[in-house]
Structure formats: structure tokens, C-alpha cells
């Protein structure tokens, strides 16, 4: 399969000078036994396919990649339609990079698209919305439920119940079913992500994240 993707990519664009393709997967069977005697079992497959390309044009080389995956079996991601879409996306981004110019220095507004920019949201905001930090008062969001903590129009949701996505789970590692948890809505802080211990200590329900 990887050799087929490599050959198809090179045939699609004569500027291709390098192709790197990876397919990785894992299969976990999870059993959780809580002190209250509740037992939970789950199967958690995880697959990711990634395509990286390097183009050369007029002596200039630029690279780009595209990847996708989720909680599904390998056959979901080895379909030609799946990997061909990733190849085209990687080639498209590399083509744009060939036309890029140096970014000017200074402070400016930027637009972040979907995908990896969400990691910035996860690190800068997500960890601060975890229940233990807020119970202990060490988060900048502690005690601020109902206050405006972001610009209007900003809504942050944790949802582990979306089917077959990389972060999807039937339940968390304590057996709490995952759900759609609105953390920030239109800039207003609505709640925190809670495990069983901190939910009990704060008098709220666990959120299954």
C-alpha cells in the first residue's frame, strides 16, 4: 500500500522529488473496575495515515504533509479515495509553499484554521479548564464561572462522544461516559472538565472527558 501511494503521488505531479508515507495503528482493549464495583469494558482501535511530499520548481524545494485517522480499523483508511485525498491535500499545500514569501516581523492579527492550531487552544486554554487546577485556585479561570474570559464569538467545547474521531471515547478512564461539555460559550466561562474526585469536591457532576 505504501509503495502504491508513493508511485501514485509521483505520477500525479512531475515536481515531486520525495514522498514519505506512514501508516500506524494500535488496538487497545480496556477494562475498568471501580471501587464501587462498577465494571466497564471497551475496545479502542486507533489508526493514522500520513503523507509528506517535497516539490522542486525552478531550483526551489518546499515540503508539506497531510494526515488523517481515527478510531477505526485499517480498512477504513486504505481505501483509494481516502489516501488519494490526502495526497492531493499535501501536494496542494506544497504548491502554495513554493509561492510563499518571508513573513514580515511584528505584531499582527492571524487567522488559524482547523487542525493543528487546535493544539495551541488545548495548551493555552484547555489545561486551565481542568477541574483540579480550578478547585485549588491555581488556574486563571478559577472562580470565574459566568464571567467573560474570551472574545465574543469564541466557544470552546470538549466532546469525546463524536463518533470515530481520534479523541473519541465511550467513557473516560474512570468509567464516566463521554459527553458534549460546553466550557466557554460566546466568550463566557460556563464550566470545567471534571473527573470524579474533583467533581465531588466541587459539588458538580463529572464530565467524562
Residue ranges and their predicted role:
Residues 1-180, 185-188:
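Active-site bordering "gate/hinge" segments
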Residues 185-209:
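C-terminal, non-catalytic macromolecule-binding modules
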Amino acid at each position: 500500500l505504501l509503495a502504491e501511494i508513493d508511485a501514485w503521488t509521483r505520477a500525479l505531479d512531475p515536481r515531486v522529488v520525495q514522498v514519505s508515507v506512514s501508516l500506524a495503528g494500535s488496538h487497545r482493549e480496556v477494562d475498568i473496575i471501580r471501587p464501587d464495583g462498577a465494571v466497564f469494558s471497551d475496545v479502542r482501535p486507533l489508526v493514522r495515515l500520513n503523507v509528506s511530499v517535497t516539490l522542486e520548481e525552478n531550483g526551489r524545494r518546499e515540503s508539506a504533509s497531510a494526515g488523517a485517522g481515527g478510531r477505526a480499523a485499517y480498512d477504513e483508511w486504505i481505501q483509494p479515495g481516502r489516501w488519494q485525498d490526502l495526497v492531493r491535500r499535501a501536494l496542494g499545500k506544497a504548491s502554495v509553499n513554493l509561492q510563499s514569501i518571508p513573513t514580515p516581523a511584528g505584531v499582527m492579527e492571524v487567522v488559524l484554521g482547523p487542525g493543528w492550531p487546535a493544539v495551541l487552544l488545548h495548551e493555552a486554554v484547555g489545561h486551565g479548564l481542568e477541574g483540579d487546577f480550578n478547585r485549588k485556585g491555581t488556574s486563571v479561570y478559577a472562580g470565574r464561572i459566568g464571567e467573560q474570559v474570551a472574545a465574543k464569538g469564541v466557544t470552546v467545547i470538549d466532546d469525546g462522544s463524536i463518533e470515530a474521531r481520534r479523541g473519541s471515547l465511550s467513557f473516560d478512564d474512570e468509567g464516566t461516559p463521554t459527553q458534549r461539555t460546553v466550557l466557554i460559550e460566546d466568550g463566557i466561562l460556563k464550566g470545567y472538565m471534571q473527573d470524579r474526585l474533583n467533581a465531588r469536591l466541587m459539588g458538580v457532576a463529572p464530565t467524562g472527558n
